[in-house]
Amino acid sequence: MTAGTAVDGARAVLLDTCALIWLANGDALQPQALSAIISAGSADGIFVSPASAWEIGMLSRPRQGRSGAVSFLPDPQSWFARFVAGPGIRIAPLLPEIMIAASFLPEPIHGDPGDRLILATARHHQMPVVTRDRKIIDYASAGHARVIAC
């Protein structure tokens, strides 16, 4: 899929947390996703959900049953702030209606609160989600969202 017309009428994409991390780390992305991100960036239309900040915080803390925390240097808050200060990147507004809509997404949807908020944000602003998350891709294939696989 191509980037959608969204916030302020510009072509825009919403990065899932995994896409945000891979983009920040310079990891390889699918050509279609990279093209959509570059196009959106030229119009200040690369959006990141505040839910991704929460997910990054959760990934960075040690938890039982997990091999180790993910390092975001120098710390998760600075890492996230540095990423969203990049050219073409904006924080997507997390409005009360988006938060409520995340509780009422069309089924079938899994229970991950971060993914639900990201999907509700994308639906509200009519943006595709750039992701490699199989659950989000499957949700989109059911017609409930648009994705660009990365």
Task: Give the ranges of each region predicted by the language model.
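Conserved beta-strand segments of alpha/beta enzyme cores
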Residues: 45, 88-90, 146
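Phosphate/NTP-binding elements of NTP-utilizing enzymes
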Residues: 56
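Active-site-proximal, substrate-binding regions of enzyme catalytic domains
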Residues: 60-89, 97
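Active-site neighborhoods of divalent-metal-dependent phosphate/nucleic-acid chemistry enzymes
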Residues: 85-132
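Short, well-structured N-terminal submotif of metal-dependent ribonuclease cores
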Residues: 1-48, 64-76, 134
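Alpha-helix capping/helix-boundary segments
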Residues: 19, 52-53, 98, 118, ...
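Acidic, PIN/NYN-like endoribonuclease modules and their adjacent C-terminal/linker elements
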Residues: 1-8, 119-150
